């Protein structure tokens, strides 16, 4: 995404445009297929020569989550990871050996969740599905 669009996105979210916010948003745009922790963000920005405090990163990530720019997840590692909220629903399969995260969408699972909710008198407003297993690479390496 272009910097102009990032500025507009921050303003549309009611956030003041600041250097740290732009850097962090740009980082998530360039790593759009990854799930990044606050520590990952800090490490990547340091490698790029950007001086920013860890507390600032945590604060910006929280603000972005509240503004609907990022989604937060808690996978097997126990630490929060973030990804851009692209507006599309998807679920996750996480490798318990190497931490690889695979996103997927399955209409059959979605329909079954709706059916279960309806049978129990609920209407789903949100959900998160995390499946844990061993990826094919780790299986091949014998990390069962």
UniProtKB/Swiss-Prot annotation:
Region (DNA-binding): 1-86
GO cellular component: cytosol; protein-DNA complex
Family that this chain belongs to: Belongs to the Fur family.
Pfam families membership: FUR
Protein name per Swiss-Prot or TrEMBL: Ferric uptake regulation protein
Keyword Cell division assigned: no
SUPFAM superfamilies hit by this protein: Winged helix' DNA-binding domain (SSF46785)
Highest taxon of source: Bacteria
Chain sites annotated for binding Fe cation: 89, 91, 110, 127
PANTHER family: FERRIC UPTAKE REGULATION PROTEIN (PTHR33202:SF2), ZINC UPTAKE REGULATION PROTEIN (PTHR33202)
InterPro entries: FUR, Fur_C, WH-like_DNA-bd_sf, WH_DNA-bd_sf
UniProtKB keywords: Cytoplasm, DNA-binding, Iron, Metal-binding, Repressor, Transcription, Transcription regulation, Zinc
NCBIfam families (UniProt xref): PRK09462.1
Region annotation (Dimerization) ranges: 87-144
Quaternary data: Homodimer.
Biological processes, Gene Ontology terms: cellular response to iron ion; negative regulation of DNA-templated transcription; negative regulation of siderophore biosynthetic process; positive regulation of DNA-templated transcription; regulation of DNA-templated transcription
Gene assigned in the entry: fur
Subcellular location: Cytoplasm
GO MF annotations, alphabetized: DNA-binding transcription activator activity; DNA-binding transcription factor activity; DNA-binding transcription repressor activity; transcription cis-regulatory region binding; zinc ion binding
Function, in words: Acts as a global negative controlling element, employing Fe(2+) as a cofactor to bind the operator of the repressed genes. Regulates the expression of the fbp protein.
Residue numbers binding Zn(2+): 35, 83, 92, 95, 98, 103
């Amino acid at each position: 995404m272009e910097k102009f669009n990032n500025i507009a996105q921050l303003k549309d979210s009611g956030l003041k445009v600041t250097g740290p916010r732009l850097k962090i948003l740009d980082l998530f745009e360039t790593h759009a297929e990854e799930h990044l922790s606050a520590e990952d963000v800090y490490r990547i920005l340091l490698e790029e020569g950007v001086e920013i405090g860890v507390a600032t990163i945590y604060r910006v990530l929280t603000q972005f989550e509240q503004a609907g720019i990022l989604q937060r997840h808690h996978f097997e590692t126990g630490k929060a990871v973030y990804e851009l909220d692209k507006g599309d629903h998807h679920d996750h399969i996480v490798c318990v050996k190497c931490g690889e995260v695979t996103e997927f969408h399955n209409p059959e699972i979605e329909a079954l969740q709706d059916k279960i909710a309806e049978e129990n008198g609920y209407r789903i407003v949100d959900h998160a599905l995390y499946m844990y297993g061993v990826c094919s690479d780790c299986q091949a390496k014998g990390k069962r």
